[in-house]
């Protein structure tokens, strides 16, 4: 058995790509446009795990509400500096729903409300402003 990918349906492909590429540092590995089916598939991967991909599926012109992403659970990424990653995502307009108070774990949501867990690679001591930030909403 070989794990291939996790598929996520997205409403705004550009916003979602910005979140995963600029915000988290993933890279686009391939893209397929299907004119007949009216959809785009974009595959993303992290440099350290190139064979474990996320497939973004964008159905052209769809206004369908895919429901609450929290039912999905979450995607998890190990990051080299959780504070810098959270600061970058926050500067891009994303809410850090569970701040990295302990220097180890945080949660943010993608543009399509997918819960994303960020885990620190190695140890960082707690630091402000993160250490005293409360949770915001659900994560």
What are these language model-derived features?
Residues 30, 62-64:
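Short, P/G- and charge-enriched loop/turn segments at secondary-structure junctions
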């Amino acid at each position: 058995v070989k794990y291939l990918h996790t598929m996520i349906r997205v409403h705004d492909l550009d916003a979602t790509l910005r979140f995963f590429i600029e915000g988290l540092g993933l890279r686009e590995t391939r893209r397929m446009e299907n004119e007949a089916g009216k959809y785009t598939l974009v595959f993303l991967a992290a440099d350290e795990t190139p064979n474990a991909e996320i497939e973004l599926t964008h159905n052209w012109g769809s206004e369908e509400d895919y429901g609450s992403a929290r039912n999905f659970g979450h995607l998890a990424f190990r990051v080299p500096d959780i504070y810098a990653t959270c600061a970058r995502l926050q500067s891009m307009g994303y809410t850090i729903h569970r701040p990295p108070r302990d220097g180890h774990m945080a949660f943010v949501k993608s543009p399509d409300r997918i819960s994303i867990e960020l885990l620190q690679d190695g140890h960082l001591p707690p630091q402000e402003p993160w250490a005293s930030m409360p949770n915001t909403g659900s994560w």
